């Protein structure tokens, strides 16, 4: 005889009125898109009404037109900034997550190394950005390094918190089962810490764009930060806002990629 609970679940699954995954996704983005469209419409209407000149605040149609007209130029510089963001973020993740585990596992390191890391984190990154230009020039590496430094600390702290949060009784159980250190790390410690790690990665994803743009402000021959400075020099407000739209698109896309990676690596937390 079929279990009533299974029958109920099957009925719910086959219910034609149950919302599909696409419908849920569409509903999730419908309201933000509607709010954004309403904001742009109000902006387009209010700026001419208030007689604000274009060199102060352009209407959305002006900078979207500029975004289309100069799409080749803006795309070229956007890809450069995106490359800096991705490389700096990945470097921070590759270094900070294992380091967080090592610091938590070796208590003397937590007492000796972590305070030094905190000290260097307190140094404003924008203050040392000119030094990177002097030391490493105007190429890609200074921007990637600055992005790395901004992403490193949030990911490290989140990783340490996640590795430290594992119940000691779970570790006793793994030892009693004869699991090796590598098996415990791969099958127990990392999955248990992933929630914390991704919290840090999401914060770092926001800081990554800031690091790349600040690095380009200080010294660069390409990138959205360079275009922003060029637009500011000539009071080219449509170009400035077009660059901001492109930068926002990169940030949103990168944030969604991190969310997608979280869903891929943590399917048990996927919302139904």
Where are these regions (language model features)?
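Generic hydrophobic transmembrane alpha-helix motif, especially the helices
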Residues: 117-154, 161-162
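Periplasmic/extracellular loop-to-transmembrane helix junction in inner-membrane transport proteins
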Residues: 16-25, 48-93
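Short cytoplasmic-facing helical segments at TM-TM junctions of multi-pass membrane proteins
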Residues: 155-203, 224, 228
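Transmembrane-helix boundary motif in ABC transporter permease subunits
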Residues: 88-117
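Transmembrane alpha-helices
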Residues: 145-149, 182-215, 242, 246-247, ...
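Transmembrane alpha-helical segments of polytopic membrane transport and secretion proteins
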Residues: 1-35, 256-272
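Glycine-rich helix-loop "coupling/hinge" segments at transmembrane-helix boundaries
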Residues: 134-135, 163, 210-247, 266-272
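C-terminal transmembrane helix and the adjacent membrane-cytosol boundary/short C-terminal tail
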Residues: 107, 195, 241-272
């Amino acid at each position: 005889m079929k279990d009533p609970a299974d029958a109920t679940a099957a009925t719910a699954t086959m219910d034609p009125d149950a919302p599909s995954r696409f419908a849920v996704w569409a509903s999730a983005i419908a309201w933000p898109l509607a709010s954004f469209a309403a904001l742009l419409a109000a902006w387009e209407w209010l700026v001419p009404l208030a007689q604000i000149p274009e060199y102060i605040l352009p209407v959305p149609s002006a900078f979207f037109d500029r975004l289309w007209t100069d799409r080749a130029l803006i795309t070229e510089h956007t890809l450069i900034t995106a490359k800096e963001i991705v490389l700096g973020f990945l470097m921070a993740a590759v270094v900070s997550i294992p380091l967080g585990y090592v610091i938590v596992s070796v208590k003397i390191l937590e007492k000796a190394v972590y305070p030094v890391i905190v000290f260097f984190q307190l140094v404003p990154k924008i203050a040392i950005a000119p030094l990177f230009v002097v030391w490493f020039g105007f190429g890609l590496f200074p921007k990637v390094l600055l992005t790395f430094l901004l992403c490193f600390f949030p990911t490290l702290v989140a990783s340490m918190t996640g590795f430290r949060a594992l119940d000691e009784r779970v570790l006793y159980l793994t030892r009693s089962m004869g699991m090796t250190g590598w098996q415990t790390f791969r099958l127990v410690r990392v999955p248990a810490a992933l929630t914390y790690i991704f919290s840090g990665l999401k914060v770092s994803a926001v800081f990554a764009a800031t690091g790349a743009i600040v690095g380009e402000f200080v010294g660069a021959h390409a990138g959205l930060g360079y275009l922003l400075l060029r637009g500011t020099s000539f009071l080219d407000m449509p170009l400035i806002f077009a660059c901001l739209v492109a930068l926002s698109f990169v940030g949103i896309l990168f944030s969604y990629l991190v969310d997608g990676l979280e869903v891929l690596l943590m399917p048990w937390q996927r919302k139904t």
